[in-house]
Amino acid sequence: RNTLYYIVPYIPLMLAASLVVAQILSQTRRGVTAFRVLYDIPVLTSWVAASLIWKTVLSPEYGALNNILALFGIDGPGWLLDETWAMPAVVLVSVWKDMGFFGLILLSGMISIDRGYYEAAELDGAGPWQKFWKITLPLMSPSIFYVLIVSLINAFQLFPQIMIMTDGGPNGATQVMVERIYKYGFRYYRMGYASALSWILFVIIMICTFIQMKGQKKWVNYDS
């Protein structure tokens, strides 16, 4: 259940953030180079280091986020200690970490689109929003499909940020499938149970991937 609670907001948020990153990186305006450096930092940072940093930032006592909120008179929650906020906090940290990598993949699909389509659309009076929805998104669909496949598999394999930031707490609010497999296998030494959970996870991922592969025929456009 917690794994699903993580996946449902993570996938659309990550995809939206990655599209924004790709759109910004595709521009040639001043300041884009600096943005490229900033977006590279989360990608190059290991999950262990990133999780430790965010665990400190989200600390209720001395965390930077709650200190900033206090300046505006807002009493911030115990992000990783509150059952309501723990999983949303993990989701947002994961989006921050992954959007650079997936944004780069989407960027490769975006810059491969023939500029002639946009020129023809401009002659027909299409605006930026119309060009994005009618040209960019349809022709980027193979890249978007790849991102959806990989991000869904990664989401099912959620582990390091949970172990470091929450350890499955509070009260099991962030205990996900892989973290449960790890604990039963290497803390409680119930290898049989952990192996069974691993096979269940494998089957779930395989079924979801199969459904995505079948469904992509209806919306993915491989013709440029």
Predicted regions mapped to residue ranges:
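A structural signal for multi-pass alpha-helical bundles of membrane permease subunits
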Residues: 1-224
